[in-house]
Amino acid sequence: MRISYKALGANGRLGNQLFQIAGTLGRAQRAGDINNAVFPNWAYQPYFNVPNHYFVAANEITATIDGGYAYMQDLREFSSCTEVIQEFFQPTEFAITEARSLHRHFNQHAHTTAVHVRRGDYLGIPATFTVCPIHYFTQAMNEMRAKFPETHFLVLSDDSEWCIENFAQFTDVTVVTSPINATPVQSVMADFNLMRSCDAFIISNSTYSWWAAYSSQSTDVICPSRWLNGLASTQIPIETLLPNHWQRRSIDPIGPMRTPQLLVSEGDDGFIITDTRSRKIHNLNASASLLFELCTGSNTTDDINEIMNMVFPDDSWASGLQELLSLGLVQPAL
């Protein structure tokens, strides 16, 4: 019986879809014949070297063992056929030609490090996903500079404005913006193949950059030490998701304060914070939001004092910190 994944293209974006293909191929291999895998026709077929015989019209996929809506984000799913996966997931000549026509950044530097910053939808679902903080990227970039002094960083993101604001001051960094006059599929693949062409990687907790790094076969990959939050982290264990040779780095805050079980979103005037323990909602004004972000993010105590004393020369911000503490919105780091 054939092994299928009928939901391909309808359950997550490109990174998730690559895991679904790899996992299904792995299951078919374990069942006796990798060629028994079958998928519905796929928007990204022209960009990868997966043989066309694996794809058929959706209504032709019948009497199969189907993967349902499993994400299959587990190296063990395709450990029996990793060489085949690497071969199938290499870019076609068409993919490379199109990417080069949309991005001018190929082969402009002797050594390049791809930096992928995933923000976008993650900002709205903090219970499941942590947005990698700025210090994760800056510290990882410094590691790469020490190892590869000539490297040039290509930063790709779904939030290029944030990246320009935080990285544009560095002369060895280029923030890559999405190509104009490209379809969504063309844009996704141009960015993916530009990333994949790099020599080293600093990835977010994103399957998109995971596959760019993995399929490049680079030995120089820095990745977050934590991928998901809460219950989701037990469903996709980090130990079976990340290759052993990738260098894991913390994405935990380095500020002097920690947050308890809070959900944080952005309102018109400041942060809206929901305490999941009491379900109480706190609306912070702009100055309280600034202090909350500084104390729980990528800033040392000295950084916080310097910034807040510039904003509030009369030292009045200290009472604001006490208010955050009394409300239980922050607590001292241990």
Model-derived features: positions:
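N-terminal pre-catalytic "stem/leader" segment of glycosyltransferase-like enzymes
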Residues: 1-39
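Short hydrophobic beta-strand segments
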Residues: 1-9, 34-37, 110-121, 154-155, ...
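Donor-binding and catalytic core of enzymes assembling or modifying cell-surface/extracellular glycoconjugates
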Residues: 10, 14, 148-240
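Long, charge-rich, low-complexity alpha-helical segments
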Residues: 277-334
